[in-house]
């Protein structure tokens, strides 16, 4: 199964939890995480939107963030080899969730992320063959395949954190 399909499945699992858990999604459990499950999912939805925009730009070969000269990320291959994201990283301000998450907005953003991943998958593009990179502020310059892997791994990471907060 490819990265985009796995991402879609993870986002679907988040949507299912949102339907099942209701108000529990908005409770912070400080012994489990500094964020509520809704905040984890909100952060993930925003970050996924940005990551998939990078994939779309790279596939299209257009975009002001594309860099053909940047050296490839050395950190992303390490994360891929590790198989998961370590805990404890601080979210960039642009994707930091508010204290109170609007559930309708969150549902819309998760659905939009799924749709974006499906649209990219439907192009049939071989992401590993796409040229160019877009720089991630912490991980360095990543190609389209790495951005898709990042989105999937990041989603799985925050799904697991959300589940832990919910005790499920």
List where the protein language model places each region.
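Short, contiguous alpha-helical
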Residues: 27-80, 122-168
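Short, charged, low-complexity loops and linkers
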Residues: 1-4, 32-33, 98
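Helix N-cap and loop-to-helix transition residues
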Residues: 21-22, 36, 101-105, 143
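Amphipathic, well-ordered alpha-helical segments in soluble domains
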Residues: 10-20, 47, 51, 113-116, ...
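Acidic/histidine-rich alpha-helical segments that form the ligand environment
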Residues: 6-7, 74-130
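Extreme N-terminal tail/first-helix region
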Residues: 1-13
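A short small-residue
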Residues: 24-28, 90-99, 134-138
């Amino acid at each position: 199964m490819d990265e985009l399909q796995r991402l879609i499945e993870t986002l679907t699992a988040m949507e299912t939890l949102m339907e099942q858990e209701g108000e529990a999604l908005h409770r912070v459990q400080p012994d489990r995480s500094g964020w509520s499950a809704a905040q984890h999912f909100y952060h993930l939805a925003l970050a996924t939107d940005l990551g998939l925009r990078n994939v779309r730009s790279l596939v299209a070969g257009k975009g002001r963030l594309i860099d053909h000269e940047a050296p490839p990320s050395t950190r992303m291959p390490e994360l891929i080899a590790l198989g998961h994201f370590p805990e404890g990283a601080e979210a960039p301000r642009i994707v930091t969730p508010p204290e109170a998450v609007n559930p309708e907005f969150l549902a819309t953003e998760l659905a939009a992320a799924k749709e974006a991943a499906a649209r990219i998958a439907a192009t049939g593009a071989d992401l590993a063959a796409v040229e160019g990179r877009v720089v991630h502020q912490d991980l360095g310059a990543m190609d389209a395949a790495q951005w898709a892997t990042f989105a999937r791994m990041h989603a799985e990471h925050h799904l697991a954190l959300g589940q832990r907060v919910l005790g499920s």
